[in-house]
């Protein structure tokens, strides 16, 4: 899976984090931005804990097989806003565009289906699907996810080194896990 176009904005910005922490403008902005970047990365994208793209971004997923007629493949990152292009490597050695694909959801998972998939040629990954994933703009990201990002960034800012209480390492606040639990993909 490859991110072709990263999000144009983040769900929570530096001003929001600064306000959450009640800090003055300019105060430790470099460290704050680092904490915010880590917190967003914790939840966003293919490597994020949720298995979701938060703000619209373009991804390409490649597959080792091409389904038969009427078959489908699962896109591993949601929510899928649109399927932008599907290509199949042909026996002639070129990439053919699949027309009229259908996007459907089943059990919170996104699938792409086509009535007639082209016959693939020899290629380790003969099927490429480019799609846009994310809730929309930063304002469209569910508020519990945004709040979890704020809490996690604040935790990183305040606990600048591993915290040990009575010989045990302190963990990230449990409330963060509760905020994002309804949004987690089943396979994460």
Show where each model-derived region lies.
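Divalent metal-cofactor coordination and adjacent catalytic microenvironments
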Residues: 1-188
